Amino acid sequence: MPETPIDPDLTAQVLVEALPYIRRFRGKTIVVKFGGNAMVDEALKVAFARDIVLMRLVGFRVVVVHGGGPQIGNLLERIGKETEFVQGMRVTDAETMDVVEMVLGGLVNKEIVNLISAQGGRAVGLTGKDGGLIRARKLEVEQPGPENQVPEIIDIGHVGEVDHIDPAVVEMLDSGEFIPVVAPIGVDERGTSYNINADLVAGKIAEVLSAEKLLLLTNTPGVLDGAGHLLTGLSPERVDELIADGTIAGGMLPKIRCALDAVAGGVRNAHIIDGRVPHAVLLELFTDKGVGTLIRRQPE
């Protein structure tokens, strides 16, 4: 099958449009949370890896944080381990945590490293345990009780939240021009392992590194208004209004809160982008239109 001819005018247009963004973000830190359909579709995985390698080649300091919920669920099903969810979070006993570490720290993490390497990049996979990157604490989940009664605390096992980020190992890898690929597993002061939401880990790492941008890949176009239209740019104040009137709800809420926390914590911009679009990361960074919703710390 003959190759499709390359349109030189289109190529030139793309490069000219990208040049100001490359100049602007060169030397800046970009944290990317890899998840959703982009993690299971083979073509999207390759496109993502190419995007990451190109970002590093043009001088961006890139950190990848990944999830892996569907892959964890698939392996638990294969071994006959039943899964229970509370408020959308997987109840994680010791046996399930072993599976989580195997899948996130092993299978998924190393697959992403291999994908990046296959595109000419130099990636190093690690979990939050490596180099003391993520210190975790147990997540307390409150179950609302009857009116005027104290909420019940539900134990969902080895599910945690970020207590502290020590970026030394990430900074060391970056100084050697490696791309850190982080699995969201943390450990507390007693050595207990916890599975942590990957969006939250990406946001906290972005804060500590004073990142220019946090990119969260999703299975939606971004934040939509009541009529289903994409909202391309939002201030924190406007986000609060949309949450209050119910426009932002359901599964988008945790991602929005993660983006807001990151922006409040010093990240300049947070983006919620459609990971189903090939090369979504480059389109968001290097073009005027982008493919998602931008949340700014302040008007630019």
UniProtKB/Swiss-Prot annotation:
| Listed name of the protein | Acetylglutamate kinase
Q: Which GO terms describe its cellular component?
A: cytoplasm
> Pfam families attached here?
AA_kinase
**Under which EC number(s) is this enzyme classified?**
2.7.2.8
Cellular localization per UniProt: Cytoplasm
| Residue numbers marked as site, Transition state stabilizer | K33, K255
Source organism's superkingdom?
Bacteria
Q: Which InterPro entries match?
A: AceGlu_kinase-like_sf, AcgluKinase_fam, ArgB, Asp/Glu/Uridylate_kinase, Glu/AcGlu_kinase, NAGK-C
The UniProt catalytic activity note for this protein reads: N-acetyl-L-glutamate + ATP = N-acetyl-L-glutamyl 5-phosphate + ADP
Gene3D superfamilies assigned to the protein according to its UniProt record, in alphabetical order: Acetylglutamate kinase-like
NCBIfam families named in the record: argB (TIGR00761)
Q: Organism source for this protein?
A: Halorhodospira halophila (strain DSM 244 / SL1) (Ectothiorhodospira halophila (strain DSM 244 / SL1))
